[in-house]
A protein has these predicted regions:
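Basic/polar, cationic surfaces and motifs that engage anionic cell-wall
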Residues: 1-12, 46-50, 67-69, 76-139
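Short, surface-exposed glycine/acidic/tryptophan-bearing loops
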Residues: 57-74
Length: 139
């Protein structure tokens, strides 16, 4: 079993309201990026449904230098529909509720893990909101 010390949250960096599926992300990661598998463990759709992308026993490909000991949660969205991919918190109410659900579950499985946004490790806006609004779940 992998030692998990971080939960790292991401956005798909797609315009507000545009749905992306696990298959879409997998195609981008595997076909376009030539990765061995999809990078995220979980993807939260616009309707708040949580989709398993990658077994937690397998390291993701989502945050250079931190993949080995982390779980990746990603939500669909994160950019304004302005044609410029401007970072924006586009979470739907359903996605916000889904974050509470999945982060609560992950904290129960990995009580020593800390919560982070991708932007804490890379020069990015991802996940386009302050993930630490959910820190109360990790107390």
């Amino acid at each position: 079993m992998r030692e998990i010390n971080r939960i790292i949250c991401h956005c798909t960096a797609t315009p507000e309201g545009r749905q992306q599926t696990v298959a879409d992300i997998k195609r981008m990661h595997v076909v376009d990026n030539h990765w061995s598998h999809i990078g995220y463990h979980y993807l939260i759709y616009l309707d708040g449904s949580i989709h398993n992308c990658l077994d937690e026993s397998i390291p993701g490909i989502h945050c250079s230098g931190y993949n080995k000991h982390s779980i990746a949660v990603c939500y669909v969205g994160g950019c304004a529909a302005d044609g410029k991919l401007t970072a924006k918190d586009t979470r739907t109410p359903e996605q916000k509720a889904a974050f509470v659900k999945i982060l609560t579950q992950l904290h129960k499985r990995y009580p020593a893990a800390t919560l982070h946004g991708h932007r804490e490790f890379a020069a990015k806006d991802c996940p386009s909101f302050d993930i630490h609004e959910y820190d109360y779940l990790f107390k």
